[in-house]
């Protein structure tokens, strides 16, 4: 396609606007195995950018499980789970997820994004109302749009605003669904789950909780925010991913048998896509076993989180109760400059900018496999960089 084609000329104009606003993004290439230290664009750096909270993505046991599954079953599932793509391994993983979450059943999707898309659009339509937290993940927001339901947002974690919307609108719709992240991925704070459950019950409303950043991190056994708040076996829908603390790929929905059976028959993003590969499925299953058998991994993660929060809590830290720590900066230029300086000194903690978030920040993801030396080194460098860039009026 010629660059001068007038039909596509708007693309260059749009890109120029994105660059002018400092919103332009390009991927950075990692050429090593996942871990607390990675090789990024040829440079060895300590990795504070990964969602691999337990350090399992490079664990030999996950790798061996993936290899064994590939040798036994091939590289791909080769079809929809309803045609030629279903394997016993999928069923084993779903049972393991249900056991972890203490739900009746679970369903594995090819990604967490697809799990949210498919679930929300299957259980709601134009006769229904969806109320979502303002800071929800894109997959929750776009799944709601896809459903055709009326979609309203409430201010972040503002239960009074949510209640007011329900009092005003609930009676006008057949069914209603409240959607929320359990851990808000760009802030690190938690949803107010017990209160949300009480409101959902009062207004006869379904509740869907996205545990993407909670599973493997929070809860007595690592089951997530639902377990953390002692809300296990309450009437709700749990959605999550296998690609963060569990170190693999894919997504899941956990809930009642009726819900899961319904989704097998109505969730388009499960029905009309190839099943999760044997390698990814086996790796996720191995990760769940490790999560349950090695609680010390999660304990070490929280020790690392506590050290960082204690040392850096007065550096514009956004309130956090998770492995995601965000530090506010005045504008995208400051955030980009600080992210570049951190990288130059051997620490990968990227700048996050609008439109992904309302305000610019450095986002730090903590891992169980960060060593004490790496934690202390990061604290020292971060303090120096933050003092320099947070006060830079010329950026």
From Swiss-Prot:
Its EC number(s): 2.3.1.47
Gene Ontology biological process terms from the UniProt entry: biotin biosynthetic process
Signal peptide: none
Catalytic reaction annotation: 6-carboxyhexanoyl-[ACP] + L-alanine + H(+) = (8S)-8-amino-7-oxononanoate + holo-[ACP] + CO2
First-tier enzyme category under EC: transferase
Binding site for pyridoxal 5'-phosphate: 112-113, 185, 210-213, 241-244
Required cofactor(s): pyridoxal 5'-phosphate
InterPro entries, alphabetized: Aminotrans_II_pyridoxalP_BS, Aminotransferase_I/II_large, AON_synthase_class-II, AONS_Archaea/Proteobacteria, PyrdxlP-dep_Trfase, PyrdxlP-dep_Trfase_major, PyrdxlP-dep_Trfase_small
Organism domain of life: Bacteria
One matching Pfam family: Aminotran_1_2
Assembly information from the UniProt record: Homodimer.
Function: Catalyzes the decarboxylative condensation of pimeloyl-[acyl-carrier protein] and L-alanine to produce 8-amino-7-oxononanoate (AON), [acyl-carrier protein], and carbon dioxide.
Protein name: Putative 8-amino-7-oxononanoate synthase
Organism the protein comes from: Picosynechococcus sp. (strain ATCC 27264 / PCC 7002 / PR-6)
